Amino acid sequence: QAKRREAGLVVRARDVKILLQWFEHDVMSLAGPALAVRQELYDFIISELKQRAGKSYPGVRKLRTALHNQRNQLLAFAGVLDQKLADIAQHFQLPLQAVRDICLLHRKHPTSNAYWERWNQLHSQLFGKFHGVMEAVGEALKKTPRASSLVENLNSRLRNYFFLRRSLGDSYLSLLQFFCN
C-alpha cells in the first residue's frame, strides 16, 4: 500500500510541476498570447490544480487558492502589452496578428534554428516594415513590467512597516502614508 501511495504522490508531483511550467511559460511569459488566451489557460491550470489538491495536499490547495485570488492582478501586464501591440499594428498599418507573431518571436532563443526560420518567414511577410516593427515590439516588451514583480517588490519593502503598525498605532500609519506619498 505504501508503494501505491508513493506512486500516486510521484504522479501528482509530476502533474503539478508540469502545470506550473505551463503557467510560467505560457501564461506569465511576457512575450506570449493575448490576454483572453492567457485567462483561459490560467483558468484551466487553476481547474487542474483544484482536481489535484484534495484534503491531503494543503500546499497545492494553498497555491491554487492564491493563484485563483490574484488572477486579475497577475495578468494585468498582458492587457497593457496587448494595447501596446495594437498601437504598433495601427502605426505600421499591419494586422495585429503579424505584430503578435513578432512578439512571439522574442520567446525563441536568438541562436536557435527555430528563431531564424521564423525570423526569415516574418521578414519575407513584412519586408520593409519588419525591422521597425521588431524594434517597436522589443521596446514595448522592455517597457511593460509584469505586475507581479512590482507588487512583490513593493510588498517585500513595506511588509515590515505594516507589522510595526500593530504595536505603534494609527499615528504611525499616518506617518507611513505621508512617507509613501
Residue positions per predicted region:
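Acidic/histidine-rich catalytic cores and adjacent linkers
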Residues: Q1-N181
